[in-house]
């Protein structure tokens, strides 16, 4: 796959590598994004439904590594853990 995923970056406190894969129309994705902003952490995110071609394929391939059902939101933390769906308690515990 030659496509590159162009992530958006949200500035904040560095709590490790945090990547949010979301859909622009997803309420739970918006809640997850809002929680990350409330926590004041730096994170990267992408709205997968706004991607096309190789970039979309690459994003879906990456999500499936962590979440075979490819559901949203998928929040990957430090390339070692994935929280699927909006789970405020798990997100707060994982980010500290």
Each predicted region: which residue ranges?
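Short, contiguous strand/loop micro-motifs
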Residues: 18-20, 46, 50, 78
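Loop/helix-junction capping segments adjacent to catalytic residues or to phosphate/diphosphate-binding pockets
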Residues: 26-29, 53, 84-85
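Thioredoxin-like thiol-disulfide oxidoreductase module
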Residues: 48-69
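Local sequence-structure signature of Cys/Sec-based thiol-disulfide redox active-site neighborhoods
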Residues: 3-44
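Non-catalytic, surface beta->alpha helical segment in thiol-disulfide oxidoreductase systems
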Residues: 77-96
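Short, basic, helix/turn surface patches
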Residues: 64-81
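Conserved strand-to-helix beginnings and helix N-cap segments that scaffold or border functional pockets
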Residues: 30-33, 56-57, 88
